């Protein structure tokens, strides 16, 4: 096996140009089997406004996947209505010559195949050489693959390079999707503007190598090269499920730096050699070396679990940084790679991994959990090294671009250092400690759900044979046989049977409520009963993945399994599943929950005196607001306010922050839209500074294009911005998109800042556990609450310290409150 492996063993379209003969459209093209089968035309490029033969103006080239039936019949390139819609907009915007062409030049009845792309690529390559474009827009994955030889990222604003040209290729949505989806259409226009003014994005390391560190000279050379980098990015590939498999191991570990096009890769046999791995160990443990990873807590945890090394110097996470700079950005490496010219870097291994995943599922059936965790062992050594190396190189380049972006948003990076970096460390310990689950209780809960489902099936039996899991059969029963009506349609034109529709029909026929109950039971069975059992490890605990970047609001999310959407404790199912949450003998579970946190955050940020006074007084906030508006809203004195009025006030209080419409508020509290508006106006009228703050956040968002969260105050008492969330829909002509973006302008600061209070508290609690050697563990976090498992004799100490740590923050005179049970 060679010590150096090429990162890009295959070329792109530009390298396939054949200079010795012209490649003009040919109705009897000998290269393509598609013509012979479909008898379709071979359609060439439409030069549009470009003067024939004039390449001095460096045109834009737009590539569509292949001719439509309309193009084929008319013999006119790119004349289909979907293509024309794109053409009209591009021509009107760019004000420069544009050439339109295809990835595959002939129409076919089915989707474009890889073989057809390869057969037609010389034609496209000829176009690229002839027109020497400054930028290529590839509409649809087939068009993108025709140009660069790899798949497009899932996100529309990815890019790659056309070989050795000084020309980049931007992946755009399929033109047919743009024609039918207004959301994608509006997003496309904004992304097009960004890329049209992008300058010169970075090129991929076409001459880079994955260097296999298989001898001590190579190991020392790797250390010397990496230690000179501004920072070192690292990535691991593993076999097995951490916490669950005794044979969990590292298959490889790769390092790279932002100023390098090479990666240094230690494979499994090199990792197990103490002498050979010593330089890599020094990199991981040296606090003077700035380390960066993509979802770094996974890599850190894997290294700790597999080889016992603590990565003390980890300082950056490109995945989390991406979310801090742009909440709405998809943050997977396959997506981020497209922002630094590395798009498609995972394609070579993808097919092998998918085949191995299918093989494992076929082998073990439903018993296997997370088959992809075992699939990487099937990669040939060279492909594994290249895959791992490209991951490290991509992470380095992504992180470097984010590092540069932080120069424009220094407060965001400061917030990473002050809060989020520590949260990543703390969450890794929460995952490691795990949440205690009693397997027998889960089995008992599963049996109970089966009994309930059997009873509902008896209800279904009176309506004849139908499958309650089939949306088509449910629709047939409800709308054709029973005559109910749905006010919502699916994309295919059928009446919808989604949850919202069925809830509107609830009470109009017994079978509707039975179907809703059936779906709830099935979801509980798949998530918290049968679905929970494979996640209970030998230690009697569940070790979920807790994600720092899982929600746009900044809140943590949880998966494998999701422990954050458990039914409320005041419901039957909620009580039953909670019986499985059992601390180990001699220990107790403690839950600490912030009280009305988001409303307190709104008071802190707006400094509304009335809101602040209510919280300082310690009274029930929702009851007090109901009393404040009782005469205006309901025509009753404050002392006559009842529970129903408090419930209505609570809905409006949160609705103000979430931007709920009067119609939605009316449905929530069971009154007319007019009455809901009166309650809203009455409450908001008592909080004038809150109203002005909401208007100010919206005004600032429209000016800057961003919503912000806040953390701390400066010397003048002003809130310091922490995270940024671009609001791309503020200027949208679609009223729904625009309204959603406007709501986010003031909801993001509240929810995101509340999330940061929770993150900061988690860090402090975990630090306290370690610093004081406290006999307890922080075992789960759910939105505004944390759960600890502590020794019985330490409960009082735990409660006092938890309250102290969670309420210690600077809140501009608005006290925080924590409910502990």
Roles of regions detected by a PLM:
Residues 148-154, 158, 166-169, 173-176, ...:
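Metal-dependent phosphoesterase core characteristic of DEDDh/y 3'-5' exonuclease domains
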Residues 197, 201-268, 309-313, 338-573, ...:
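Conserved "right-hand" nucleotidyltransferase catalytic core of DNA-directed polymerases
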Residues 668, 787-791:
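Short hydrophobic/aromatic beta-strand micro-patches
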Residues 134-141, 233, 288-296, 589-591:
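Acidic beta-strand-to-loop metal/phosphate-binding motif
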Residues 2-203:
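A polyanion-binding, active-site-adjacent surface
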Residues 686-687, 804-813:
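A common structural junction motif
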Residues 390-397, 743-766:
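Conserved pre-motif C helix in the palm subdomain of viral-like polymerases
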Residues 60-62, 70-71, 75-82, 86-87, ...:
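Conserved RNase H-like, two-metal-ion catalytic cores of nucleic-acid enzymes
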């Amino acid at each position: 096996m060679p010590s150096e492996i090429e990162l890009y063993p295959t070329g792109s379209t530009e390298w396939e140009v054949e200079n010795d003969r012209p490649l003009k459209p040919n109705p009897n093209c000998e290269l393509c089997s598609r013509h012979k089968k479909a008898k379709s035309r071979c359609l060439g490029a439409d030069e549009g406004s470009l003067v024939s033969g004039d390449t001095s103006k460096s045109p834009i080239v737009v590539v569509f996947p292949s001719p439509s039936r309309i193009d084929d019949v008319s013999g006119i390139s790119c004349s289909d209505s979907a293509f024309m819609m794109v053409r009209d907009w591009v021509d009107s915007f760019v004000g420069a010559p544009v050439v339109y062409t295809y990835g595959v030049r002939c129409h076919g009845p089915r989707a474009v195949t890889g073989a057809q792309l390869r057969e037609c690529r010389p034609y496209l390559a000829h176009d690229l050489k002839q027109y020497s474009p400054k930028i290529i827009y590839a509409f649809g994955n087939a068009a993108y693959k025709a140009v660069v030889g790899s798949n497009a990222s899932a996100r529309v604003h990815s890019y790659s390079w056309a070989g050795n040209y000084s020309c980049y290729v931007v992946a755009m949505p399929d033109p047919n999707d743009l024609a039918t989806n207004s959301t994608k259409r509006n997003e496309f226009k904004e992304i097009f503007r960004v890329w049209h003014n992008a300058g010169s994005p970075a090129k991929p390391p076409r001459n880079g190598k994955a260097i296999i560190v298989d001898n001590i000279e190579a190991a020392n050379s790797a250390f010397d090269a990496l230690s000179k980098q501004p920072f070192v990015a690292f990535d691991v590939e593993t076999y097995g499920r951490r916490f669950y498999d005794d044979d969990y191991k590292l298959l490889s570990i790769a390092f790279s730096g932002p100023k390098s096009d090479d990666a240094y890769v230690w494979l499994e046999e090199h990792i197990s050699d103490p002498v050979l791995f010593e330089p890599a160990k020094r990199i991981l443990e040296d606090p003077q070396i700035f380390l960066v990873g993509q979802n770094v807590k996974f890599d850190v945890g894997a290294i700790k679990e597999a080889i016992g090394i603590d990565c003390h110097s980890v300082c950056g996470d490109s995945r989390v940084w991406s979310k801090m700079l742009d909440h709405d950005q998809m943050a997977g490496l396959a997506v981020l790679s497209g922002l630094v010219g590395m798009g498609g870097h995972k394609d070579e291994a993808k097919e092998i991994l998918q085949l191995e995943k299918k093989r494992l599922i076929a082998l073990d059936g439903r018993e296997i959990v997370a088959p992809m965790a075992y699939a990487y062992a099937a990669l040939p050594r060279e492909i594994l090294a290249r895959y791992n190396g490209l991951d490290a190189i991509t992470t380095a380049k992504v992180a470097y671009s984010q590092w540069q972006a932080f120069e424009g948003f220094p407060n965001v990076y400061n917030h990473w250092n002050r809060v989020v970096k520590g949260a990543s460390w703390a969450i890794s310990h929460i995952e490691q400690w795990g949440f205690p689950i009693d397997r027998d209780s889960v089995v008992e809960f599963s049996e109970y759900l089966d009994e309930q489902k059997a009873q509902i099936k008896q209800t279904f039996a009176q309506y004849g044979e139908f499958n309650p899991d089939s949306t088509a059969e449910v629709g047939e029963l409800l709308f054709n046989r029973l005559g109910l009506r749905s006010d919502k349609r699916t994309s295919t034109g059928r009446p919808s049977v989604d949850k919202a529709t069925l809830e509107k029909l609830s009470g109009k026929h017994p079978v509707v409520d039975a179907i809703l109950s059936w779906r709830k039971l099935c979801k509980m069975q798949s998530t918290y009963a049968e679905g929970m059992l494979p996640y209970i490890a030998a230690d009697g605990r569940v070790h979920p993945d807790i994600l720092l970047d899982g929600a746009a609001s900044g809140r943590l999310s949880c998966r494998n399994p999701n422990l954050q959407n458990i039914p409320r404790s005041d419901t039957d199912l909620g009580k039953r599943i909670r019986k499985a949450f059992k601390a180990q003998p001699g220990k107790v579970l403690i839950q600490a929950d912030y009280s009305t946190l988001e409303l307190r955050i709104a008071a802190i940020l707006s400094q509304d005196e009335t809101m602040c006074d209510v919280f300082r007084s310690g009274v029930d906030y929702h009851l007090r607001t109901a009393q404040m508006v009782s005469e205006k809203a309901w025509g009753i004195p404050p002392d006559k306010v009842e529970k129903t009025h408090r419930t209505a006030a609570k809905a409006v209080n949160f609705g103000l922050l979430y931007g709920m419409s009067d119609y939605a508020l009316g449905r929530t509290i069971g009154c007319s839209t007019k009455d809901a508006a009166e309650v809203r106006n009455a409450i908001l009228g008592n909080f004038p500074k809150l109203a002005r703050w909401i208007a100010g956040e919206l005004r600032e968002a429209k000016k800057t294009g961003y919503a912000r969260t806040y953390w701390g105050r400066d010397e003048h008492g002003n809130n310091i911005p922490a995270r940024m969330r671009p609001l791309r829909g503020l200027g949208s002509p679609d009223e729904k998109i625009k309204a959603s973006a406007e709501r986010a302008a003031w909801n993001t600061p509240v929810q995101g800042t509340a999330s940061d209070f929770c993150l900061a508290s988690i860090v402090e609690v975990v630090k306290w556990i370690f610093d004081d050697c406290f006999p307890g563990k922080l075992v789960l976090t759910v939105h505004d609450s944390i759960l600890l498992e502590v020794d019985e004799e330490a409960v009082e100490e735990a409660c006092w310290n938890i309250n102290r740590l969670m309420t210690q923050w600077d809140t501009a005179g608005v006290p925080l409150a924590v409910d502990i049970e």
